[in-house]
A protein has these predicted regions:
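Conserved N-terminal glycine/acidic-rich loop preference
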Residues: 208
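Conserved alpha/beta-domain cores
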Residues: 1-196, 204
């Protein structure tokens, strides 16, 4: 078993354990492998180990990888854009990716896309997203657009070392997610939790965790 396959197995075991501890089935939580800055060869190893959903932060890099695997005839992959959504790159995201996790305003593009509304749950100026109180308005606007499929919410909470505080923030997201589900039948995804807060996020109700370094190793931003 290579390193990436081994790492994936360990992460999946952690997800299963976290789900079991709060009475949930592991199948309720999707693992999104964050492959930003990683070469196609690393993604190929993950695919060989059964991984199908990948997250990319940079539009051009992601598009190149998507094209690579399409040209190679690899099917069944899901590509999620999880980086800040710039207006001048939104068309490329809609044309190439299956999902966008970082919608925080009404998109201008017209290509079909599954979208998550990003919530700035910790009210950080350095992060994108809308405050929770703005959710109802943006969700209603997105629901009116037939080419967009509103699937749920995403958040990147401020780092917290204590589980209790991680869980408290995650519960705020889970409550908002549950309320959104009652209004829109397509809503089924709460993208919440990374390596350091995955267990609290799953306990609170996350349905998708975003894991990168624990699978692919440290990132090289120099390239």
């Amino acid at each position: 078993m290579n390193d990436i396959a081994h790492n994936l197995a360990q992460v999946r075991d952690k997800i299963s354990g976290a789900a079991a501890r709060c009475g949930r089935a592991p199948e309720e939580v999707t693992l999104l492998a964050v492959s930003k800055t990683k070469p196609a060869s690393a993604i190929e190893e993950a695919i060989a180990a059964g991984q199908r959903a990948f997250g990319e932060n940079y539009v051009q890099e992601g598009v190149e990888k998507i094209n690579h695997f399409q040209q190679a005839g690899v099917s069944g992959l899901q590509w999620h854009f999880i980086g800040p959504l710039q207006s001048n790159k939104s068309r490329l995201v809609a044309e190439h990716f299956d999902w966008c996790h970082t919608v925080d305003r009404l998109p201008l593009y017209r290509s079909p896309l599954k979208v998550l509304i990003q919530i700035n749950i910790s009210d950080e100026q350095s992060k994108s997203g809308i405050p929770l109180e703005a959710l109802d308005g943006l969700a209603a606007e997105i629901a009116e657009l037939p080419h967009l499929e509103l699937r749920g919410l995403m958040a990147i909470p401020a780092p917290e070392s204590e589980y209790v505080r991680q869980f408290a923030v995650a519960r705020q997201m889970a409550v908002a997610f549950a309320r959104l589900k009652t209004r829109y039948p397509t809503v089924d995804t709460l993208s919440l939790g990374m390596s350091d807060d995955m267990e609290a996020a799953i306990a609170a109700g996350s349905t998708m965790v975003r894991i990168g370094t624990a699978i692919f190793g440290a990132r090289d931003y120099s390239k």
